Amino acid sequence: MLPMITGFMNYGQQTLRAARYIGQGFMITLSHTNRLPVTIQYPYEKLITSERFRGRIHFEFDKCIACEVCVRVCPIDLPVVDWKLETNIRKKRLLNYSIDFGICIFCGNCVEYCPTNCLSMTEEYEFSTYDRHELNYNQIALGRLPMSVIDDYTVRTILNSPQTKNGVNPLI
C-alpha cells in the first residue's frame, strides 16, 4: 500500500511541475504578443546597414601607391597587386589590382592599414552569382560605388515601413 501512495505522490508532483513549465512557456508567448515583427521580406525590403558594416571593398586606383600593405596584413594574402618600377621617377606604378570575394573573409584589415585610404568598405553584400570566377573583381569593378539602399527606389526600406511611421522604431 505504501509504494502505491508514494507513486501517486510522485505522479502528482510531476503533474504540477509539468503544468508550471507549460505556464511559464505560455507567459513568454503572451509577453511576445505586443512586440512588432522583426522579420523583413528580403528581396523587397532591406535593412539599413550600420556604419561599421563590412561589405564589398571599394578601391580608388588613383590613390594607390602599390605599397602592398594590404597584402601583408591580409590573413589569406588575398589582394593581387601588380606593379612596375618606374626607374626614371623611382616609384612604383600600379598596373593591376584585384580581390577575389569568393575567398575574402571581410576582416577589414586591408582597409584599416592602408596608408593612403584608397580602400574602403561599402554597404553592398549581395554577391550572388552562378560562376565563382565572377567574384574576382579587378580595379574597374572595385572602383564602382554601389547604389545605396536608401536611394534605391525599387526597395521599400525599413524607414518607410508603416511600423516606423507610427512612432515605433523596432530595429534602429
From Swiss-Prot:
One GO BP on record is: photosynthesis, light reaction
For activity, the cofactor(s) needed are: [4Fe-4S] cluster
Keywords from UniProt, A to Z, are: 4Fe-4S, Chloroplast, Iron, Iron-sulfur, Membrane, Metal-binding, NAD, NADP, Plastid, Plastoquinone, Quinone, Repeat, Thylakoid, Translocase
- Membrane topology according to the record: Peripheral membrane protein
Keyword Magnesium assigned: no
The UniProt entry, under InterPro entries, shows: 4Fe4S_Fe-S-bd, 4Fe4S_Fe_S_CS, NADH_quinone_OxRdtase_chainI, NDHI
Primary location recorded for the protein, binned into one broad class: plastid
Question: What family is it from?
Answer: Belongs to the complex I 23 kDa subunit family.
Q: What is the recorded function of this protein according to its Swiss-Prot or TrEMBL entry?
A: NDH shuttles electrons from NAD(P)H:plastoquinone, via FMN and iron-sulfur (Fe-S) centers, to quinones in the photosynthetic chain and possibly in a chloroplast respiratory chain. The immediate electron acceptor for the enzyme in this species is believed to be plastoquinone. Couples the redox reaction to proton translocation, and thus conserves the redox energy in a proton gradient.
Q: What is this protein called?
A: NAD(P)H-quinone oxidoreductase subunit I, chloroplastic
Source organism per UniProt: Capsella bursa-pastoris (Shepherd's purse)
The major lineage groups are: Eukaryota, Viridiplantae, Streptophyta, Embryophyta, Tracheophyta
